[in-house]
Amino acid sequence: KDGYPMNSEGCKISCVIGNTFCDTECKMLKASSGYCWTLGLACYCEGLPENVEVWDKATNKCG
């Protein structure tokens, strides 16, 4: 699945520019790849395993 990975507080993982950081973060979660979605200033992962939680507007717990 694809989506925004979360940190321990349930927030999207922030990024500013460049994809290397997000690609590394996503691959640690067993995704196929990741990039920095600049408009949202957050990492976005593609090809995540189904059991990895991703950020969802409906269940957002980020302060």
From Swiss-Prot:
**Known tissue expression:** Expressed by the venom gland.
Which Pfam family, an example, fits this chain? Toxin_3
Main subcellular localisation: secreted
Give residue numbers for the modification (Glycine amide): 63
Q: Which PROSITE patterns does this UniProt record tie to the protein?
A: LCN_CSAB
Record carries keyword Thylakoid: no
Give an example GO molecular function.
sodium channel inhibitor activity
- Signal peptide extent: none
This molecule's function is given as: Beta toxins bind voltage-independently at site-4 of sodium channels (Nav) and shift the voltage of activation toward more negative potentials thereby affecting sodium channel activation and promoting spontaneous and repetitive firing. Is highly active on insects, since it provokes paralysis and death when injected into crickets.
Q: What's the family?
A: Belongs to the long (4 C-C) scorpion toxin superfamily. Sodium channel inhibitor family. Beta subfamily.
Q: Indicate what this protein is called per its UniProt record.
A: Ct-IT1
Organism annotation: Centruroides tecomanus
